[in-house]
């Protein structure tokens, strides 16, 4: 990932660059060398942005023109180490707010965290954005990702609850159900059996009732 557009960090829209990139925020634009945003993660109401460089926090602060709260950073580190199973050496948390994802170096991006990623783009060439997104989210490695399997292997160390895995799977099915009947070829290719399509329509109907606060009795 070359760059990551983080929308809402400390209430500001900030574009953080990788190698030879720049930070845009507070009316400033300064170079960042050899610093890559690994990701962000929301845990216990905190937002953590992690960089590939252990000293990236200071560089980011210089580019933005303000200092992050050291007490909040230490609190975040403690929360991640104790509750999330992350090691201090894995992370370089530099900011916190409300939404985002965190990514341990060399680990798998938590399943639910994927839905928190806002945008990915490249400085100076916005036409490369779709290619970068495709590279990140349509790679064979990502397609083979199994949320339930990761949950079992982590044994709670990543802070993922089983309910999160179930809700995530239900959300995926519901999203697929929304496409049923709209004539999208890829959907009908995947769900070509009549029984499977009927089941999707039932899920779609159930979700409508669930979203309005009314659950159907069976």
Curated annotation (Swiss-Prot):
Q: Which family does it belong to?
A: Belongs to the UPF0329 family.
Instruction: Identify this protein by name.
Output: UPF0329 protein ECU10_1860
The organism of origin for this protein: Encephalitozoon cuniculi (strain GB-M1)
